[in-house]
A protein has these predicted regions:
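Catalytic Walker B motif of ABC-type/P-loop ATPase nucleotide-binding domains
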Residues: 83-87
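Conserved ABC ATPase "signature" region
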Residues: 36-54
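Conserved catalytic motifs of ABC-family nucleotide-binding domains
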Residues: 79
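Conserved ABC ATPase signature
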Residues: 58-62, 66
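Conserved beta-strand-loop-alpha-helix hinge in the C-terminal portion
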Residues: 138-161
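H-loop/switch region of ABC-family ATPase nucleotide-binding domains
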Residues: 119-120
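A short, surface-exposed alpha-helical micro-motif characterized by mixed small hydrophobic
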Residues: 125-127
């Protein structure tokens, strides 16, 4: 499954969360109507990410955090072996960020899936990652968060002229 940094779409579109998700999960075109089984699949997916109350809301009316949780629900249907999160909380407020990562952490623990998180937020990485790959063009260092954060390579990447911190 894949959750992008952001989804580009016409925010004035009347497409609801149900329509959006059903378009990906339905065996028939959504314009023919959303079937009962598809609605059940959508509701179950939304429940996994604690956003079942959003199904009737227009996609463009969602906050950044709500939209990312809907995208997470879609990425989890069907359940993947690997979930890729590409800067998934870019532009999301602090409450949305915490809620998103708590949901991801819960899913990781209960479903035993591998999660690849691309992030520049070192606090999030330190808090939620089991393993870290530090890159600057190529792999510079890898290991558990503390080992990587305490390394000379980390200091060189983030605290020297070539780094961005």
């Amino acid at each position: 499954g894949y959750v992008p940094q952001q989804l580009e779409f016409d925010r004035s579109s009347p497409v609801t969360v149900m329509d959006f998700m059903a378009a990906s999960l339905s065996p028939v075109p959504v314009f023919l109507g959303v079937g009962k089984r598809t609605k059940e699949k959508v509701r179950a997916a939304l429940a996994r990410t604690h956003c079942e109350k959003l199904e009737k809301r227009p996609l463009g009316a969602l906050s950044g955090g709500e939209l990312q949780r809907v995208l997470l629900a879609l990425a989890l249907t069907p359940q993947p072996d690997l979930l890729i999160l590409d800067e998934p909380v870019s532009g999301v407020d602090q409450n949305g960020l915490e809620s998103f990562y708590q949901t991801v952490d819960e899913l990781k623990r209960t479903n035993h899936m591998a999660i690849l998180l691309v992030s520049h937020d070192l606090d999030v990485v330190r808090r939620y990652a089991d393993r870290v790959v530090l890159m600057q063009g190529t792999v510079v260092r890898q290991g558990d968060p503390e080992t990587v954060f305490d390394s000379d390579e980390f200091a060189q990447v983030f605290y020297t002229r070539g780094g961005r911190a």
